[in-house]
Amino acid sequence: MLAKPTIKRRESTKIYVGNVPIGGDAPIAVQSMTNTRTTDVEATVAQIKALERVGADIVRVSVPTMDAAEAFKLIKQQVNVPLVADIHFDYRIALKVAEYGVDCLRINPGNIGREDRIRAVVDCARDNNIPIRIGVNAGSLEKDLQEKYGEPTPEALLESALRHVEILDRLNFDQFKVSVKASDVFLAVESYRLLAKAIKQPLHLGITEAGGFRAGAVKSAVGLGMLLAEGIGDTLRISLAADPVEEIKVGFDILKSLRIRSRGINFIACPTCSRQEFDVIGTVNALEQRLEDIITPMDVSIIGCVVNGPGEALVSDLGVTGGNKKSGYYLDGERQKERFDNDDLINQLEAKIRAKVAAQDPKNRII
């Protein structure tokens, strides 16, 4: 197997969102946000459970009204994953969801009004062991910062974040994480770099409003990949105009590609050419769908010919190399006497993968 790259993780304090550690030496948590009406309890619960099934560590829910807060109470009772309540402007909503067992508050102290209101929320969070996420966004910078800098800049996002941090520091509250999101990759990356040097709190990564599935996934992979490779980031959310389930899958794929955290099978497959001896694309697509239930980390190479196939198989947990009517089979980097019939390759490969998972990791764990 390939050696794991060395990424020196930025030192940060550790907080807990429910039972999920964020920061310090904790695994980088992957989260998403519901896009249902929160007052539609049934739909919201169904979406949260779908996110849980694909590995979401944390789920954020928008709570814009008191009616939504009452719905949040019912939602919280029906799910297991930690929930973050996304709240703006009305501090009373924060107090209400705290009463209902929220695991984290996404709330900017500076936009909920007078000092006494801020103190009420912070005191409530402290009394109930609820962390706070300060979430700065390039699209909603304070007016004075827009006037000062003329446009969103890394320095403007940093100054906004530090304003909110200063409020919590003044109130002796240190259980918080911070994000400085932008839809522009370079703006977001440089803002996070500045913030990483300025504070010790955990950082929540994201390229906000990244776009539809394809463009948003690419933007997020580029931006977050740059930061993660530098050791910056303690939790992440991929923002897509798509099914939130896809956000979790893309998030894990980014971490998997950097070998930071793995979930499920990492398929290594050739783009195909006229040398392929079997339908590589169809095989990979079918296996990705069939094996979504597997969370044990594993590298599986599926190469259509003998040019690169043997080399990839040598560094894979399980590999197949295309041959005439029958394809070569590798296990833990060693070629096996057994060969696969190309006409039944998908079924045979699925059986071998499941057998290896059962032998290697009976509990099918995630790392």
Curated annotation (Swiss-Prot):
Swiss-Prot/TrEMBL keywords: 4Fe-4S, Iron, Iron-sulfur, Isoprene biosynthesis, Metal-binding, Oxidoreductase
Metabolic or biological pathway, per its Swiss-Prot or TrEMBL entry: Isoprenoid biosynthesis; isopentenyl diphosphate biosynthesis via DXP pathway; isopentenyl diphosphate from 1-deoxy-D-xylulose 5-phosphate: step 5/6
Cofactor note: Binds 1 [4Fe-4S] cluster.
Function (record text): Converts 2C-methyl-D-erythritol 2,4-cyclodiphosphate (ME-2,4cPP) into 1-hydroxy-2-methyl-2-(E)-butenyl 4-diphosphate.
Gene: ispG
Matches recorded under InterPro entries: Dihydropteroate_synth-like_sf, IspG_bac, IspG_bac-typ, NO2/SO3_Rdtase_4Fe4S_sf
Biological-process GO terms, alphabetical: isopentenyl diphosphate biosynthetic process, methylerythritol 4-phosphate pathway; terpenoid biosynthetic process
Similarity comment: Belongs to the IspG family.
GO molecular function: 4 iron, 4 sulfur cluster binding; 4-hydroxy-3-methylbut-2-en-1-yl diphosphate synthase activity (ferredoxin); 4-hydroxy-3-methylbut-2-enyl-diphosphate synthase activity (flavodoxin); iron ion binding
Organism for this UniProt entry: Pasteurella multocida (strain Pm70)
Record carries keyword Nucleotide-binding: no
Residue sites binding [4Fe-4S] cluster per the record: 270, 273, 305, 312
Name of this chain's protein: 4-hydroxy-3-methylbut-2-en-1-yl diphosphate synthase (flavodoxin)
EC number of the protein: 1.17.7.3
PANTHER family: 4-HYDROXY-3-METHYLBUT-2-EN-1-YL DIPHOSPHATE SYNTHASE, 4-HYDROXY-3-METHYLBUT-2-EN-1-YL DIPHOSPHATE SYNTHASE (FERREDOXIN), CHLOROPLASTIC
Cofactor field: [4Fe-4S] cluster
Catalytic activity: (2E)-4-hydroxy-3-methylbut-2-enyl diphosphate + oxidized [flavodoxin] + H2O + 2 H(+) = 2-C-methyl-D-erythritol 2,4-cyclic diphosphate + reduced [flavodoxin]
HAMAP family, per the entry: IspG
